[in-house]
Amino acid sequence: MEIPVEFLLEKTIIVTAVFTISLVIAMYSTYAERKVSALLQDRIGPNRAGPFGLLQPLADGVKFFMKEEIIPSSANKALFILGPSIAMMTACLTGAVIPWGSYLEIGGDQIALQVTDINIGVLYIFAVVSIGVYGVMIGGWASNNKFSLMGAIRASSQMISYEIAMGLSIIALVMTTGTLSIGEIVQQQTTDWWNIVYQPLGFFIFMVCSFAECNRTPFDLPECEAELIGGYHTEYSSMKLGLYLFAEYINMFISSAVMSAFYFGGYDIPYIETLGLDQNTVTILGTLFFFTKIVLFIFLFMWVRWTLPRFRYDQLMNLGWKIMIPMAIINIIITGACILLF
């Protein structure tokens, strides 16, 4: 079956746009991280590279490219290179099923601002995120360094533990919406209340698990400098280290987008239809509103990092297995009871 050229061109443009936006936001998240930490610590932050330090991410990128590529002599070279590649690849793939806006009307055609709206989009995100564990584990093991291996083991156990609670929290959301399509979940919220109204406990569980999945403070045990030097990427340098750091910030961006889409209406602006605007204007405003929500969640990630202390490892595991998972199961029971009664 021949694929229309227009379809290929449309999807190529959307894929390129999503990939580029993800990289740019990841770059400037590093700048925002420093500015937020400076704000909370009564400092100025980066202000040398360009006006207000806005060129600092570009300076960091040049620095990573110029650093020497070092592969330890005792490392498994193939897997050492493969680890950060897997981490970066899985971070970028998750954006394919997120609806970044409604649709644009161009030349009589409706162009959806989504790479693909598969009917199992929720499962796709969990499948891709699960593969990301291999990038961390392979990188830590291939380094042939005890600190790297310990960090990789910590990361794997942490991510697997919190994926269970995250999955259970999404089961309650799927019970409420009746679909696994992310596009349909967002579309339902444009004609009804946002899902945060129906699933406040589910959102809280999902948000906490997102912090753990992204290895962000207070869940940054896999790379805590005080115990493990740098964790699973201790032996990495140059762009291979840059790929791991980029993947972390892209994961933070995608997690913020998923939380916004699942629980806060995605691109939906309440009552915008009463303004009588044309479809393209509504879509553009909705996309800008969606990214505003994402930026607020990214700020929350950074705010928590610079205000809360790190958990001990036993506290981390106890929180995941003894508190978050039972809470998620209780949330499913409550959701089922509400569906039956109301």
UniProtKB/Swiss-Prot annotation:
Record note on quaternary structure: NDH-1 is composed of 14 different subunits. Subunits NuoA, H, J, K, L, M, N constitute the membrane sector of the complex.
Single Gene Ontology MF annotation: oxidoreductase activity, acting on NAD(P)H, quinone or similar compound as acceptor
Catalytic activity: a quinone + NADH + 5 H(+)(in) = a quinol + NAD(+) + 4 H(+)(out)
Keywords carried by this UniProt record: Cell inner membrane, Cell membrane, Membrane, NAD, Quinone, Translocase, Transmembrane, Transmembrane helix, Ubiquinone
Gene: nuoH1
Job of this protein: NDH-1 shuttles electrons from NADH, via FMN and iron-sulfur (Fe-S) centers, to quinones in the respiratory chain. The immediate electron acceptor for the enzyme in this species is believed to be ubiquinone. Couples the redox reaction to proton translocation (for every two electrons transferred, four hydrogen ions are translocated across the cytoplasmic membrane), and thus conserves the redox energy in a proton gradient. This subunit may bind ubiquinone.
Position of the signal peptide: none
Source organism of the structure: Cytophaga hutchinsonii (strain ATCC 33406 / DSM 1761 / CIP 103989 / NBRC 15051 / NCIMB 9469 / D465)
Protein's membrane topology: Multi-pass membrane protein
SS bonds (residue pairs): none
Lineage top rank: taxon: Bacteria
Official protein name in the record: NADH-quinone oxidoreductase subunit H 1
Family designation: Belongs to the complex I subunit 1 family.
EC number of the protein: 7.1.1.-
Membrane spanning stretches: 7-27, 78-98, 120-140, 166-186, 193-213, 245-265, 284-304, 322-342
A GO biological-process term: aerobic respiration
Intracellular or extracellular location(s): Cell inner membrane
Any one cellular-component term (Gene Ontology): plasma membrane
Coiled coil (UniProt feature): none
PANTHER family: NADH DEHYDROGENASE SUBUNIT 1, NADH-UBIQUINONE OXIDOREDUCTASE CHAIN 1
